């Protein structure tokens, strides 16, 4: 793995949650609550805030990653503040790395994708690794994107694999029979 900048020792990190399309807000909030309960037990965690179905306050990192656009019921995140770096034995990266598997396990139980997002040591980027797929038709682009996603998933040290392919939310259409409804 090529690394351009060393890991920093920041005072915070973020847990970004993507539930399946169409998930009710209450389910997203419940998942965030369970993730938050795990984090609250950690001695390095000073406090945390949860945001379900609404964007968290804009940070420089979030601005570049467009987290301010996250407003769907199936989207949530946790802003996690750590105790001062002089009052903890582990650096923020080590803490995030240690907690990631436990957080992902909770996410899996709720059918959620969970990403632990650290504040970068340098200028923020969309993601540490980005692959853009171009092609003449949507179906071909999506098929190639899914193959790339699978390859990334199977590569050691690549975590938080995601695509920008939007999942179709289930829909229900109701046809009101006005005559019956009035009676």
Question: Which residues are covered by each model-predicted region?
Answer:
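Transmembrane helices with small-residue packing motifs
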Residues: 1-23, 59, 63-65, 128
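Short beta-strand-to-loop capping motifs
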Residues: 17-19, 80-84, 133-136, 176
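Beta-strand-rich non-transmembrane domains
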Residues: 137, 142-183
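Short, low-order "capping/linker" segments at domain edges
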Residues: 63-64, 125-134, 175-179
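Solvent-exposed, membrane-proximal periplasmic/extracellular interface segments of envelope transport
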Residues: 1, 27-123, 150, 179-183
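Extracytoplasmic
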Residues: 10-14, 43-47, 73-77, 109-111, ...
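Solvent-exposed beta-strand sheet faces enriched in polar/charged residues
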Residues: 16, 49-51, 115-117, 164, ...
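Conserved hydrophobic/aromatic pocket- or pore-lining residues that grip, position, or stack substrates
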Residues: 15, 131, 152
């Amino acid at each position: 793995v090529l690394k351009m900048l060393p890991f920093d020792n920041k005072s915070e990190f973020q847990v970004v949650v993507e539930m399946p399309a169409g998930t009710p807000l209450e389910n997203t909030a419940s998942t965030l609550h369970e993730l938050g309960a795990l984090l609250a037990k950690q001695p390095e965690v000073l406090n945390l805030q949860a945001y379900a179905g609404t964007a968290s306050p804009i940070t420089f990192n979030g601005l570049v990653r467009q987290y301010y656009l996250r407003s769907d019921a199936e989207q949530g995140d946790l802003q996690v503040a750590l105790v001062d770096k002089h009052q903890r034995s582990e650096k923020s990266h080590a803490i995030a790395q240690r907690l990631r598997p436990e957080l992902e396990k909770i996410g899996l139980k709720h059918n959620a994708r969970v990403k632990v997002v650290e504040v970068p040591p340098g200028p923020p980027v969309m993601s540490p690794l980005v692959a853009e797929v171009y092609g003449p038709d949507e179906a071909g682009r999506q098929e190639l994107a899914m193959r790339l996603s699978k390859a990334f998933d199977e590569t050691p040290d690549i975590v938080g694999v995601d695509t920008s392919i939007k999942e179709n939310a289930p829909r229900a259409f109701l046809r009101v029979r006005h005559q019956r409804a009035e009676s």
